[in-house]
Structure formats: structure tokens, C-alpha cells
């Protein structure tokens, strides 16, 4: 027979060098009739079958012994639907010829992909089930503009790159091939021939599923349906709502006790979600679950951005996990990593032989801290790949938000680099303008396509406008992690209480920038790894002090303006650092192993969450200055802080923190509203394994000036504790009489100096007028239980502080000079 295919062309196919298979294979018009050509390595016989009549049309001639067939049908002068009946040894199969199908990609999609402005590129690129000419199969598409040849390889073609070379669309750089009869779950990759004639075997960047490491193939999976966000979930993400986030690493929250292996998505959902609900958290934040090759990266070095990791099951299993969380009223946030990717050969690195996804120059494209590659945000197709991925997770799995990892490393070209190791931007500056534009664009897309979605930035610098809308010059995030607050407060809490008075500003400085952004207060996984110790072990002192410090810190954090985030295990004060290879130490909650200390902290966190949600003053005005006021900010000597939180109606809630192991009795401070105040939470309570020192009953304000207020209350502040007071009932006050204001010290604390006669009169008065800074501090600092009896109020105030006789476990202090006083106090008791 006569064919118009040269031997050089045939050799190019078998050598894997031919770049345009559709120009040769399939059905073609010739002067002599319709010709069909087929590349079927190792086939013995090929017959053309008319699909409509099921008649044999002709047998193709084997032009090349390796398996190239061709045949001309003079009786046919127009295209028709056909199948190929192929004999391989003793096996005869009827197959669809992939090269008889027309291009599937729409002109608009092709144009948008070329422009890098496709809203949902994942709907076009990757592997998608579809039907063409009544034939079902999978359409494969890959962006690889600099490759000489791209083939699909997989279970269905013996991983032979000669069998399914793809069609190239020059305008967009996209390769395409529809392969009939490919099944759900089939494994596949793309084989690329680069410009240096090197073969590269790559996973699909847009794959919806992937193999479990160490295997690296992509897996045919179904694209989930779009999920609409409900009004309730949208409301739960708002600035004026209580947001308490439980950060979770799915691989180590809890494991199979028999073999220490991971639980699957369904098993995790059945245990984790009821626990989170019971603990009172409103959101779950998952460490990255996009497929990643190295367990030790915790997911922060992903390769398959569109594939939920197969460590815990299928994409459908992850979808069920999210659905179960929503059914329980819990929103789900995903840690998302668009800042860098690993250099594994099956991934994005030098994808088509060129720096396609990354920068070619290591000064721009190599991350020195993590030995990873940095995305080229200036390339539209790369920006499209990443923005589309954020949208994919939100709308296809119904996620309620994303937390963007390592934003600072993205927006600064000199991040973690010395002089000479980075390239300035076009204006000579250090900002990565392309990355900034990418973040603005992504946040804008998410906000417009799915209003109410929460976008959170882990940004560790003072970059301005992180949570401003893009139209106002900001990055467009809804929240930013307050890394400054976290570092300052943990630095303060690590100190021995005797030294905290010299570092008082570490807890007050945050208010200077509190309202510059919308903040989340993060106690994340980063603070309990790499030798940093657990939160519990960061605390100074003996066992009692460590737990008391941590409880006081949590109480302070939950009352401070900003949404809350706590990494798993910290809710029960796990004693060791987090280990991603093991389950959390749940046994510590057992009374025998944990002595009640850990269960006490767990109970406190549960109560903090419930109090937080119940008291709108603690969250409603987080981002507004009118929601917060320092009542005592300058008592560095006693390491006491007092502030007031308010809701939109102006209703107050007062928070008192004592960061020394010394109880403060008769501690007086001014209040804004006259009335009765009730202690509603005390981190030193018995049920939390505290000493039990409290302010039993209701405390009435008195017309005694303190801290610039005409009304004040006098309380007992437990050692190493935070106490919340709620206004139970307001009281009208007669027209204020003139009150002589006392002098203050240079640092703002109220002066203690009085003349001798005035001091004596104060001591014998039935109505106590002693201010916090005037009260004699209790010097006791022993491990023994010391009975603290508060001074009883006069009979005209029967409801206030009826008694304070609870035993308080008062711990030792580092002050050597306090030992003598402590002994005397113990003896007197």
C-alpha cells in the first residue's frame, strides 16, 4: 500500500521525539481516500471497525515491525466513527483510537490560560472525566510550553511514553490528549522530553489525588462539586464574632494504638470533631494536607497542591471530614503554602527543562532556610496555578478559610538573605512586588467569589496594611497572626516572676499597634518544636508554679483583644515537645498519670472558650479601641495588670492578672461603672488544680478614688492567676462630690506616701481606703498551704466579699530575702 508517512517520522515516534502526533496518527484525507494510521507497539494485527454498522472496514498494514500501522480506504471519502480491533499475541481487544478525537479545549479557556487569568484553571488542566462522541474517558492537559514532546503514561499503557503522545496548543503552551476507557483510580504521570533531549517523569501539578509516599504517581479522581457557604458559617468568620481556633496536625493528634499508624479521615472526624465541639473551639485549622513527599515537613513542602494527602485516605474521605465538622457547627481552615516548593524530581522543579514555576536565578528562586524553590509570581500562569488552588480548596471542599504560610518570606526579596544574595525590584527596593500583587489578587478572588471566607496571614514583620482591602492599598487578608504579641508574652512568661517587674512593658507594648491590623493571637505548632520546649516547660518554677503560670497566661490571652489559636496538646499542657511521629500524650489526662494537673488545664481551656463565647465584651470590639481600656497598667512592682473589655453596648468585663506567686489582698483599682461585680472565672480555682483563693460573693464598688476613677473595688488577687469580673448590676451614683486626687509617682503608679496621722487614721477606719499600691504585699513564698483571711467589710456592705478563707497554695519565689518573711507568715498561720 501507499502511505504518506516517512520512515524518519516513524522512527521519531518510536524514539519518543515526535512533537505533533495528530499530524500523523488518526484519520486523514488523501487523494486516494481516507487513511487511518495507528501507533500500537508490539501489536500483531489491526482491523478498522465501523462503529455505526460494526462492520470490518479494512485491515491496516504493519508499516514498521515495531508496531506502526496504516491503511487507505478508497471507498471512504469522509470521516466516520471507528474502532480498532487489535491483536496482541493471543489477546484481541477492541479499542478507541485517541487520535480520532478533535481538540477538547475551548478557545476561551485556551486564551485565558495563555493570559494567566483563568479563574478556575483546575477545571481545564489536569485529568478530567468527560465524554466525547459518546465515548467516556479522561482528558489530560498539561502546561509545559518548552517541552519538545509530552506523553501520558500510566497503568493503562504500561508506562510507555511512545503510546500516548499529546497534542500541543502553541498559543497557551498546553498539551492535551483524550484517552478513552481510563478508569477511576488509575495511576498516571507525564513524560516530557526537554530541550536538552532529557526525559523527565512528572506528577500532574493539577492532580486531584496522588499515591502515598514514597510512590509519586498521580491518580485519576473525580472533581468534587462546588460547595456553597452557608450564612451561619459566614457569620462565624466575622470580625465581631468569637473565633477560637484549634490547630491540628492530622497525623499525630491521635494514632492507632495497635500499630502507631495514622487514622483515616473518617476515623479522625469521628474522634476529633466531637472533642473540638466539647472543648468549645469554633474553628479547626489543619496543618497543610496538600500532598507532600516528606513527613518531617508536616506538609509545609507540598508538591501536589490540588491533592489531599493520601496518608489519611481519599479526597472523598477528606470531604466527609469537612462535612462532619460543618454539621457540628465548626468551621475549617486550611494551612496553605504558596510560598515555596521542594525540589523533588517528580515535582515542579525545572518542570519542562526550564525554570517554569520557579525563578531561574537562585538569588530569587532558592529559599536558603528550607532548601526549597520559590515560585515566580511574575509569571501569569504560575500566579493562575496558585490563585486557582486557593479557590479550589474553598469551593470544592467547602473550607471556610485559608491561612497563608510564611507571608514575610514571600513579600521581601531579601528575606533571610545577606547583602549580595538578593536582587532588588525594578525600583531598587526589597519588596517582592509580584508576590504582593499575587496575594492581593488571591484575596480579592476569594472575597468576591465566596464572601465570608476567612483569609489569615502568618506575617512576622511590620509590613503595613496586611488586613486592609486591596482597593485601599492593603494585601486584603481578614486577619494577621500577631507574632509580636506571641513573642513578647512568651518571653515575659519564661522569666522568673522576680524579674517580670523589669519587663512589664512586654505585656503592654502590644497595645501600641493593636488596632493597626485585625489580629489572631497564635500559640501555634511553631512554639513547641525544635528545642523550644512545650508551653508548660517554658514556664518557670516548680510543678505548681508551671501550671499556675500557664493557666494565668491562658486567662490573659483569652481576654486580650484578638481571635485565639491554640495548637493541639496545649489545651491540656502536654509536657514534652510535639512529635509528628506520635500521638499526643492523652494518658496525662488520667488522674493517676497526670495528677489532675493536665485535666485541670483542659477544664480551664474549655471554660475559657465557653466564657469567651458567652461574654460578648471579650470579642465584639476586638478591632476597635473603644473595646479595651487599661485600668491598671503601671503596677510593675507587683506584676499586676488590670483591663476592661467592653461590648458594642458598652457593657464591661474586668480582667485582673497577677504574674507573681504572691497573693494580693485588698488590691484596689478604679472602675468606670458603679455597681456590683461578680467573679465569673478564676484560673486559680480548685477545679483547675489551683489554690482555690477567690473573691466569694459579690463585690460592690465604693466611692473611693483610685487610678483616676471616682469608683473603685477592692479584691483579692490569687497568686499566678487571672480573674474575670462581670458587672452584675449597675448602680446610680449621686452627683459626684469633689474628691481630692492623690499624687502619683513618676511612672504613673499611685503614690504611697502619706503623713503619719493620715496613715494611722486609714488603718483604724472601718471603711478601707487602701489602694493596691498602698497595701502591704504578702511576702510569703513557700510551698505550704497558708490560710489567707481577708479583712471583713463594714456592716453597711453585707454583700461584698463575705469571706476569703480558702486555702491558697502559695509557691516559692526566687527572692532570698523573702525567706525570713515567708517563715514568719507560716508560723503565724
Swiss-Prot record:
Active site, UniProt feature: 405, 458
Entry keywords, A to Z: Carbohydrate metabolism, Glycogen biosynthesis, Glycogen metabolism, Glycosyltransferase, Transferase
SUPFAM superfamilies registered for this protein in UniProt: (Trans)glycosidases, E set domains, Glycosyl hydrolase domain
Region annotation Disordered: where it falls in the sequence: 758-829
Any Pfam family: GlgB_N
Record field: catalytic activity: Transfers a segment of a (1->4)-alpha-D-glucan chain to a primary hydroxy group in a similar glucan chain
GO cellular component terms attached to this protein's record: cytosol
Record-annotated membrane-spanning stretches: none
Top EC class for this record: transferase
Record keyword ATP-binding present: no
GO BP term (any one): glycogen biosynthetic process
GO MF annotation list: 1,4-alpha-glucan branching enzyme activity; cation binding; hydrolase activity, hydrolyzing O-glycosyl compounds
EC numbers, comma separated: 2.4.1.18
Family the entry assigns: Belongs to the glycosyl hydrolase 13 family. GlgB subfamily.
This protein's name: 1,4-alpha-glucan branching enzyme GlgB
Species of origin: Actinobacillus succinogenes (strain ATCC 55618 / DSM 22257 / CCUG 43843 / 130Z)
Amino acid at each position: 500500500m501507499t502511505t504518506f508517512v516517512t520512515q524518519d517520522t516513524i522512527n521519531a515516534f518510536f524514539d519518543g521525539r515526535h512533537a505533533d502526533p495528530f499530524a500523523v496518527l488518526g484519520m486523514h484525507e488523501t487523494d486516494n481516500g481516507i487513511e487511518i494510521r495507528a501507533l500500537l507497539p508490539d501489536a500483531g494485527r489491526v482491523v478498522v471497525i465501523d462503529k455505526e454498522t460494526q462492520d470490518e472496514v479494512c485491515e491496516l498494514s504493519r508499516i514498521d515491525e515495531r508496531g506502526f500501522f496504516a491503511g487507505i480506504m478508497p471507498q471512504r471519502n469522509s470521516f466516520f466513527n471507528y474502532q480498532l480491533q487489535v491483536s496482541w499475541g493471543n489477546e484481541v481487544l477492541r479499542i478507541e483510537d485517541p487520535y480520532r478525537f478533535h481538540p477538547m479545549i475551548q478557545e476561551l479557556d485556551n486564551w485565558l490560560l495563555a493570559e494567566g487569568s483563568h479563574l478556575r484553571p483546575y477545571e481545564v488542566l489536569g485529568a478530567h472525566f468527560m465524554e466525547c462522541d459518546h465515548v467516556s474517558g479522561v482528558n489530560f492537559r498539561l502546561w509545559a510550553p518548552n517541552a519538545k514532546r509530552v506523553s501520558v503514561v500510566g497503568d493503562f499503557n504500561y508506562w510507555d511514553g511512545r503510546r500516548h503522545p499529546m497534542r500541543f496548543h502553541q498559543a497557551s503552551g498546553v498539551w492535551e490528549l483524550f484517552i478513552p476507557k481510563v478508569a477511576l483510580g488509575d495511576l498516571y504521570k507525564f513524560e516530557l522530553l526537554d530541550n536538552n533531549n532529557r526525559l523527565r517523569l512528572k506528577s500532574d501539578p493539577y492532580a486531584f489525588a496522588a499515591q502515598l509516599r514514597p510512590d509519586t504517581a498521580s491518580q485519576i479522581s473525580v472533581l468534587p462539586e462546588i460547595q456553597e457557604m452557608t450564612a451561619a458559617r459566614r457569620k462565624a468568620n466575622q470580625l465581631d464574632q468569637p473565633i477560637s481556633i484549634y490547630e491540628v496536625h492530622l497525623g499525630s493528634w491521635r494514632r492507632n494504638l495497635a500499630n502507631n499508624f495514622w487514622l483515616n479521615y473518617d476515623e479522625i472526624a469521628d474522634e476529633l470533631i466531637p472533642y473540638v465541639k466539647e472543648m468549645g473551639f469554633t474553628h479547626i485549622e489543619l496543618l497543610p494536607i496538600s500532598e507532600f513527599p516528606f513527613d518531617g515537613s508536616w506538609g509545609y513542602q507540598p508538591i501536589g497542591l490540588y491533592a489531599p494527602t493520601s496518608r489519611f485516605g481519599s479526597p472523598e474521605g477528606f470531604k466527609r471530614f469537612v462535612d462532619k465538622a460543618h454539621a457540628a457547627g465548626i468551621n475549617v481552615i486550611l494551612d496553605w503554602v504558596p510560598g515555596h516548593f521542594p525540589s523533588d524530581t517528580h515535582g515542579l522543579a525545572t518542570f519542562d527543562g526550564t525554570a517554569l514555576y520557579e525563578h531561574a536565578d537562585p538569588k530569587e528562586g532558592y529559599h536558603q532556610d528550607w532548601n526549597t524553590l520559590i515560585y515566580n509570581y511574575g509569571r501569569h500562569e504560575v500566579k493562575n496555578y496558585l490563585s486557582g488552588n486557593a479557590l479550589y480548596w474553598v469551593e470544592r471542599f467547602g473550607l471556610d478559610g485559608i491561612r497563608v504560610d510564611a507571608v514575610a518570606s514571600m513579600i521581601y526579596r531579601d528575606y533571610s538573605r545577606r547583602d549580595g544574595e538578593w536582587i532588588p525590584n525594578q525600583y531598587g527596593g526589597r519588596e517582592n512586588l509580584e508576590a504582593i500583587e499575587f496575594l492581593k489578587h488571591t484575596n480579592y478572588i476569594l472575597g468576591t467569589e465566596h464572601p465570608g471566607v476567612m483569609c489569615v496571614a502568618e506575617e512576622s514583620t511590620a509590613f503595613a496594611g496586611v488586613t486592609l482591602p486591596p482597593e485601599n492599598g492593603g494585601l486584603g487578608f481578614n486577619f494577621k497572626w500577631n507574632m509580636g504579641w506571641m513573642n513578647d508574652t512568651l518571653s515575659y512568661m519564661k522569666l522568673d516572676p522576680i524579674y517580670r517587674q523589669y519587663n512589664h512593658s512586654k505585656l503592654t507594648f502590644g497595645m501600641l499597634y493593636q488596632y493597626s491590623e485585625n489580629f489572631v493571637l497564635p500559640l501555634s505548632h511553631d512554639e513547641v518544636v525544635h528545642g523550644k520546649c512545650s508551653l508548660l516547660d517554658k514556664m518557670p518554677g516548680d510543678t505548681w508554679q508551671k501550671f499556675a503560670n500557664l493557666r494565668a497566661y491562658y486567662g490573659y490571652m483569652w481576654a486580650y483583644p484578638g481571635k485565639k489559636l491554640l495548637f493541639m496538646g496545649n489545651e491540656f499542657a502536654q509536657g514534652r515537645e510535639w512529635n509528628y511521629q506520635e500521638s499526643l500524650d492523652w494518658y496525662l489526662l488520667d488522674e493517676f498519670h497526670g495528677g489532675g494537673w493536665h485535666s485541670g488545664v483542659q477544664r480551664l481551656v474549655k471554660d475559657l472558650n465557653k466564657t469567651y463565647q458567652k461574654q460578648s465584651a471579650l470579642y465584639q470590639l476586638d478591632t476597635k479601641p473603644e473595646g479595651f481600656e487599661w485600668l491598671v497598667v503601671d503596677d510593675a512592682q507587683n506584676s499586676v495588670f488590670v483591663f476592661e473589655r467592653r461590648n458594642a453596648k458598652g457593657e464591661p468585663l474586668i480582667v485582673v492578672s497577677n504574674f507573681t506567686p504572691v497573693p494580693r489582698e485588698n488590691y484596689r483599682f478604679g472602675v468606670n461603672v458603679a455597681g456590683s461585680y461578680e467573679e465569673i472565672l478564676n484560673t486559680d480555682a480548685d477545679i483547675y488544680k489551683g489554690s482555690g483563693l477567690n473573691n466569694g460573693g459579690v463585690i460592690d464598688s465604693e466611692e473611693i478614688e483610685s487610678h483616676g476613677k471616682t469608683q473603685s473595688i477592692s479584691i483579692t488577687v490569687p497568686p499566678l492567676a487571672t480573674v474575670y469580673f462581670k458587672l452584675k448590676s449597675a448602680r446610680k451614683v449621686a452627683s459626684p462630690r469633689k474628691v481630692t486626687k492623690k499624687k502619683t509617682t513618676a511612672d504613673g503608679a499611685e503614690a504611697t506616701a502619706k503623713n503619719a496621722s493620715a496613715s494611722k487614721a486609714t488603718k483604724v477606719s472601718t471603711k478601707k481606703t487602701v489602694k493596691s499600691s498602698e497595701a502591704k504585699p504578702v511576702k510569703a513564698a513557700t510551698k505550704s498551704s497558708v490560710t489567707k483571711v481577708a479583712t471583713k467589710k463594714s456592716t453597711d456592705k453585707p454583700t461584698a466579699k463575705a469571706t476569703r478563707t480558702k486555702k491558697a497554695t502559695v509557691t516559692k519565689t526566687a527572692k532570698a530575702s523573702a525567706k525570713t518573711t515567708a517563715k514568719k507568715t507560716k508560723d503565724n498561720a
